[in-house]
């Protein structure tokens, strides 16, 4: 048997092994953390994302939005992007924190690997530290769910903390009230589909408001009733046009204009029969996802039925949810179709736009937040900010314990982990201690982003915690340490837990890597 090395990969395939693979993972993940860390905290900066293809721009400081908008080639960087996406889906906020924390853990791991500490020892240390940190966090949490007034105050404080790092920070009191009112209407549900967010250009951010009802950004058909009481609503996704010849590009050859008129008459009769089938459902409102042409619209108006056309798919899905109806495509069996219901439908005007308001819907918790603003970019970023606040609040209603913000929770966990490190033997203690250093980096980054002396502030914060003042954190408005409980700077326990556990698991996953295999690109076949 020949001992010469054999090439087992395609010539274009790439293999990185050992230290090279580990270094590639560390560099990619740390680069992602460094990319987003300047957006962290109440004084974090925004990023402009510009598309090469369309030229569209997005102005945001939302970690998940930034990371999913950029093309990455590094495998480890993609892992961090996925962690950020899961954080966004699960909790709604903390997407930047989880990336930065995972990157800091890997930065510490790189130092330890260079000091000849085996990755498995580091992983074991990180596991011990994660459990210690979460136990300390849970022990320090507060639960005011038994007192409605205190719990509402906690929710408003959490909303203000979440919005402090967003574009709505200057209007955080106003939007915190809107978000809390909207979430409390859900009565404990975490389904945010019952909260519709509409963006209307014009006015200022303070003009935004919460409306108790569902608002659809469409107009009512011509000559149809503009107000409907006790509405029975048929929601459909069906073609309501007679011009099939144009739609499908077919050609019909006729030798007289009479035959053309006969063809048109047949099409109209067919549409009239379809409208009669729809009317047989005993409805007074018809909402279609597709266009409703003039002829069927006139037939509905003559029958006193309100018709609404071209409702976007997202809007019609939410509408079916809140009115209790189902989206129908065929109308042969009225007894099988589930209609939606609401007490009142009316046309309203917001700014210069006409819209349709559904009041007294089946899902009594449904409501609409109407956002006003000067530019599309401002409205889009405001929507992302209010969505983050709504997501965190809905999770807090389900898991009501809260913890302190402003770097307080991180320093409290770091202290507990440092103390645990003194009880661990050998090199494992170094890994546990490194976890505490990574936790301490989060308040350091908060202070750096605010332009303060982070070394001095974090040293003061650490000293305060070791003196037993475990409610102290960073006040980024004054540039000093302060009592976070007295300041009302709170965060959801579930959010903090998710940041620590997801960041730690992501770092451990990448620490296990010793080989990266890149497949060769598929050759393009000529036609």
UniProtKB/Swiss-Prot annotation:
GO molecular function: ATP binding; ATP hydrolysis activity; ATP-dependent protein folding chaperone; unfolded protein binding
Subcellular location field: Cytoplasm
Principal location listed in the UniProt entry: cytoplasm
Coiled coil (UniProt feature): none
GO BP term, example: protein folding
Keywords: ATP-binding, Chaperone, Cytoplasm, Nucleotide-binding
Annotated InterPro entries: Chap_CCT_beta, Chaperone_TCP-1, Chaperonin_TCP-1_CS, Cpn60/GroEL/TCP-1, GroEL-like_apical_dom_sf, GROEL-like_equatorial_sf, TCP-1-like_intermed_sf, TCP-1_chaperonin
GO cellular component, one term: cytoskeleton
PANTHER family recorded: CHAPERONIN
Family, similarity comment: Belongs to the TCP-1 chaperonin family.
Subunit structure of this chain's protein: Heterooligomeric complex of about 850 to 900 kDa that forms two stacked rings, 12 to 16 nm in diameter.
Protein role: Molecular chaperone; assists the folding of proteins upon ATP hydrolysis. Known to play a role, in vitro, in the folding of actin and tubulin.
Full protein name: Probable T-complex protein 1 subunit beta
Naturally occurring in which organism (per UniProt): Schizosaccharomyces pombe (strain 972 / ATCC 24843)
Gene: cct2
